[in-house]
Amino acid sequence: LEDNQNNLKDITIRQMASANFTSTSAIYRLCNKFGFSGYSDMIYQLSSSNNTQLFSPDDLEQYIPAFIELLNKHRQHNIIVFGMGFSAPIADYLQQRLTLNGFYAMNVVHTEMLDIKYQDNSLFIVISNSGITPRLVEIVDNAFKNNIDIISFIANENSNLYQNVTLPIIVGSYNSFTHNNLVPNTFFGQVLIVFESLLYTYLSSIE
């Protein structure tokens, strides 16, 4: 797949199966494993991922009202910022920026603060490119069930971190094959830009 990303749309599922000495059923199972609805969906997504999708000012506009509303609601509450792997240092940056601007922010998850009794007193911010990391999904699902307000910065719209949050902020586009270090991954850099833009808009609104 990686060797033929420029002409994937010309390869049928039978050709793909034959070239890899497997069956079409195995290809379908692979598609499902990666979260695609079928072979055509996988090919479309992989072909589209060749072009890096950057966040635009027009994309930002749709998130501003809800972002401002949530920060106003939790101005004096605890804000937990969390990410795993490459998202961890991004979460640390967001936490420090919030703290410097007077918020009660931390980047360590205390699960008791995501209990239902804190549903009006906690805001949970998560960063994840894929949105499918099991431990992160478990934490977010529990917070969602307890009616905790959640903001997610995420690339994968087909994940729980998009479905089960108060405000999902889509950053770029998700590629299941981003493990290839030769392919540029702009997600983490874009999260910083998007967050800074949203925070600036919020701070400007309360001056």
Describe the residue ranges of each PLM region.
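Conserved N-terminal alpha-helical segment that immediately precedes and caps sugar-phosphate-binding
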Residues: 1-207
